[in-house]
Amino acid sequence: MIKALKTVGRYIMLMGRTFARPERMRMFFRQYLNEMGQLGVNSIGIVLLISFFIGAVITIQIKLNIESPFMPRWTVGYVTREIMLLEFSSSIMCLILAGKVGSNIASELGTMRVTQQIDALEIMGVNSANYLILPKICAMVTTIPFLVTFSIFAGIIGAFCTCWFAGVMNAVDLEYGLQYMFNEWFIWAGIIKSLFFAFIIASVSAFFGYTVDGGSIAVGKASTDAVVSSSVLILFADLVLTKLLMG
């Protein structure tokens, strides 16, 4: 318990240093754009790929499991849309990104720590936490709404592909179900949740990487701890935010 409280205290103190005003805005902006490409743009491929197949699989599974003469055929599209909007494209996708992006951030900062690059920045009078971590957090929070949007569209395209190429159901029925009682707030709720998840991924992973103490083995452990901790916090935040936004 004491160790956990110490960890939380160190995290809060690190975030206090991180959210200081950047000393050189031009350098910060350059680093910010670089992190957007590394953390956000480079994640588009895996987001589109996973979302496409998940959308297709959800459609097939729902069609097989709720097929009934008493159930309208468009129900498949309706349920697929709700799953993609409310949970998969925001929560589950961020859990996947926690593994990809979180381990990337933790290993990068951990390697800089064990090779004393962070110490060199401190000696030069640079706020290393602000210089290294803040661009990553801002980049993740900025790009995550686009990734969520891409995920939603990729999942819907995957659902339609099951109609066009696999003949699972009529595409007209699927389209009607996707449009039935559509509530645009569900999209905004998913984006709002993803903003919190993006902050958790970037800040928690940066904390474990920045505070590494040891050699290469410690860097590997920090990457694992970053992914596990981020995933647990995302699930907890998902529970709280879903209650607040949808309750």
Where are these regions (language model features)?
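Membrane-interface helix starts
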Residues: 23-49
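Active-site cofactor/substrate anionic-group-binding motifs, chiefly glycine-
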Residues: 39-92, 96
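Final/C-terminal transmembrane alpha-helix of multipass membrane proteins
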Residues: 219, 225-242
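Short cytoplasmic-facing helical segments at TM-TM junctions of multi-pass membrane proteins
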Residues: 109-134, 219
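Hydrophobic alpha-helical transmembrane segments that constitute the membrane-spanning cores
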Residues: 50-53, 97, 134-163, 196, ...
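Selective transmembrane-helix segments that form parts of the transport pathway or gating/packing helices
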Residues: 40, 44, 48, 88, ...
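Membrane-interfacial helix-loop-helix connectors in multipass membrane proteins
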Residues: 61-85, 153-195, 203-222, 244-247
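Short, membrane-interfacial amphipathic segments enriched in basic
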Residues: 1-30, 208-209, 213
